């Protein structure tokens, strides 16, 4: 039985200024942590994040709206608790803050389940292969070409064997020149992806895809807004590229509709905003049923368990906004891969003493 729920909010400065085509400059991110303690004293940890804004709203949803779904509930009945949270928040918001709040709780519940079972989550989820290929997600739209190459060299030195860069500069020629320079720097066979962060119109995305065709991109991510299913389906048909998307699809139904419409070819859920492991695994099943590979967005220390448990995964995104500095045992990248930890639960241990100096409110 769940006895205690603790929610904390932290504002964590980013190691460097990050920029993409839609969100502008990012100077910090907000980390929302949820700790759930059962009557036997075991505690599960979950977390989600926002960039620059919105963290207080997520934390408040957990504290004021979801706490009632948790206290006194059987922590083993995760699906039942998930449904209770979903319908409690359904009218207030079916995505964004609502599913981020649900995610943090759901992740904590699964962590608690793994801890009590003394089993890592990737095994609890069925187990496939703990070694997962990763790519370095650069948030680098404003970097000059020389710095872009330096960043790539740093990624390579850190063990990465695949890289994603940002596109969506005001002039398409700038994007072409930057991608060309990095492709030449990395070599023709190196897996290189690009992310437009929804910057382009449908016609603009098709023009950009054709202009970038010579560089043999592994995929193009979020070429336009995900809400335009018809437009994205046209991009899929006419671009000649694999089209990834999902960080802004926040429900199972969003992914179902996108897959049914043919508006993406590579689903990319984020376990910290999709509704936690519970929904992520349903999206994984949806992808498998439609003969699609599966990637992910963000929080790779958590995501690795979900991808290590399925056969149809491809490269997992690895970026943590500097959160590794506050982890006891962050995952290391070796020859382009990370290994899911064998510790019970998800195995992430945060240094709350250090984080305490960054607490908000």
Swiss-Prot record:
Required co-factors: Mg(2+)
Annotated catalytic residues: 166 (proton acceptor), 297 (proton donor/acceptor)
Applications: The AHG metabolic pathway may provide a useful platform for the efficient production of industrial chemicals and biofuels from red macroalgal biomass.
Residue sites binding Mg(2+) per the record: 195, 221, 247
GO molecular function terms listed in the Swiss-Prot or TrEMBL record: hydro-lyase activity; isomerase activity; magnesium ion binding
GO biological process: amino acid catabolic process; carbohydrate catabolic process; galactose catabolic process
SMART domains in the record: MR_MLE (SM00922)
Domain of life assignment: Bacteria
Keywords in alphabetical order: Carbohydrate metabolism, Isomerase, Magnesium, Metal-binding
Family: Belongs to the mandelate racemase/muconate lactonizing enzyme family.
Function as written in the Swiss-Prot or TrEMBL entry: Involved in the degradation of 3,6-anhydro-L-galactose, which is the major monomeric sugar of red macroalgae. Catalyzes the isomerization of 3,6-anhydrogalactonate (AHGA) to 2-keto-3-deoxy-galactonate (KDGal).
Protein name: 3,6-anhydro-alpha-L-galactonate cycloisomerase
Organism: Streptomyces coelicolor (strain ATCC BAA-471 / A3(2) / M145)
